[in-house]
Amino acid sequence: MTLEITGSELIKSKLIDAPERSGVYRMFDVNKQVLYVGKAKNLKKRLTNYIKSNLDNKTLRMIANTCFLEYSITNSEVEALLLEAQLIKKFQPKFNILLKDCKSFPFIKLRLDHDFPQLLKYRGKTLSDGKFFGPFASSAEVNTTLTELQKIFKLRSCTDNYFNSRTRPCLQYEIKRCYAPCVGKINKEDYRDLVTQVKDFLQGRTKELQENLSRKMEELSSQMRFEEAAEIRDRIKALSYVQLKAGVSDVVKDADIIAIVEKNGHYCVEVFLYRAGQACGNIPYFPTSTENSTKEEVLEYFLLQFYQKQHVPAAIIINHEINDKENVIEAIKKINNILQLNITVPNKGGKAKLVQNAETNALFSLEQYLKKFAKNQEIMFEIKELFGLSEIPERIEIYDNSHIQGKFAVGVMVVAGKVGFDKKEYRVFNVHAPSLVCHSRESGDPKRLMDSCFRGNGIKNCGGDIKGDDYEMLRQVLTRRLTRLRQEPHKLPSLMIIDGGKGHLGVVKEVMDKFEMNIPFVCMSKGVDRNTGFEQFHVIGKEVFTLDKNLPVMKYLQILRDEAHNFAIKNHRLGRSRAIKISRLDDIEGVGETRKKALLHYFGSYKAVCDATIYELAKVNGINKLLAEMIFNVLHRKN
């Protein structure tokens, strides 16, 4: 049921039929974009609160923008909590407390489907086909742990293809980071013993592991096998060092320690991860849209959004009570399909000390965040004044392109917000000639693009040959971007910055007029000698101007431009490299998908195929000597 009236009158009209039952309501703006999702024990009472006179500014702004209102009845408060959390995650409403940049935490995965298992970094919600340890707070934590484990236990780190193709030990064996099971330098039984030791260490059974290793060292010494005994001794020392560096807790085994702090209306939630009694790192979060919100509200919304993506430990220990704790616990249990969960607020003892430590870290993180936020706001105000914007910009989109004489052309968009770059909003546009298939992060199939790029004997352009026409590239990128903005008006930028000059200004105006959109934009070009610090700014209706290179706003604009430039070059090189690799094999008559896969499977990588001799190529199933010679000649011809 939808009524097309606005604000408080809309809410009053909905109150007539609103039930006195639990449920979820949604407020929409004129474009049917979700402004707010809320839950209620009693929908009628909750909606009545919105027509009272003592509303805060945030709520007044929300009601003023509300043009449509819908609600759904639920069977229980827990069901309402679940539905609210799911809708917030799906729509990311402007006026809800949002947890952004919440990627799933990485794990260490021990494969169990191979005679010689390997340790891998794994990120994902589904934990299957292996033994998993973690989660860890960051990829860096996982990489560091994997490096230490490889030094100590020397398990293989290579892919199956690489493992199967080896005829001699690789460099990892030479630098004593692998026992080279690929060429039989260690038998299955001894390797399995190492795997068991890794499991014991990662599961926190370090005391038992060190005792077992000590017994083994003494046994080897008594047998006069001193070199092997010395290796075990070094392993014990390394384990002690890693254990000391990581930090071990006797207070908690599997728990998340979560502390929330507030300052000047901004919140920080710091999460410390403990698994098998070992500290697995910590990470701060800064929920948005927290104006006029309480700690209880912010922490409740945080927990519900956080544990939609993260694995839930046996215990969650927090520094502040939440109002609806029992229902929150039930909701998290249902989201993650678990039976047991405790959320506690300790007042004394070891757990209270861990919470206090998390709170101290949260305060430090928030102070650093606020310094960055304040500095960024000052710069944003200067940008507003410089380019005559109506308000301080909240979202700036910067555009650039990269190509070699029109080939392998890509356009990019990077996004900056209140506290810096928003990398999840970055976009890549593979610019193409009208006759070619295109691909971007937003649409298309990369294989179709590649298939369209390589025909004949030469390496053709990936992304189309548009003869180095920067204007056509920009026209395509902006056309696609503005088309998407019609579907996502809530992502409308406050300002667009284009790396270009007067000619680019005309192209932007042309595309804006075509779409009947009026987004503020400016073109930023290098000076006459293309020296940094002498950039020129081109704005419709104004003379070209430059800024003092020492001004903070000038330095900030240069940082924005450089970020877009580097992102464009990175993706251009990636596309070019991928195109060259694919085209070399695709250009060989008689080598289709099956033989190409056979080559890559046998040798393990494209580089290994290139390094292979004719004799080695002919060993691959389906490759005869004549075809091997053709492959060798094509792969070794000059570009």
From Swiss-Prot:
Annotated GO biological process: nucleotide-excision repair; SOS response
Main localization (coarse): cytoplasm
Residue span, GIY-YIG domain: 20-97
GO cellular component, as recorded: cytoplasm; excinuclease repair complex
Annotated compartments: Cytoplasm
Record HAMAP family: UvrC
Assembly: Interacts with UvrB in an incision complex.
Protein name: UvrABC system protein C
Species of provenance: Rickettsia peacockii (strain Rustic)
Gene coding for it: uvrC
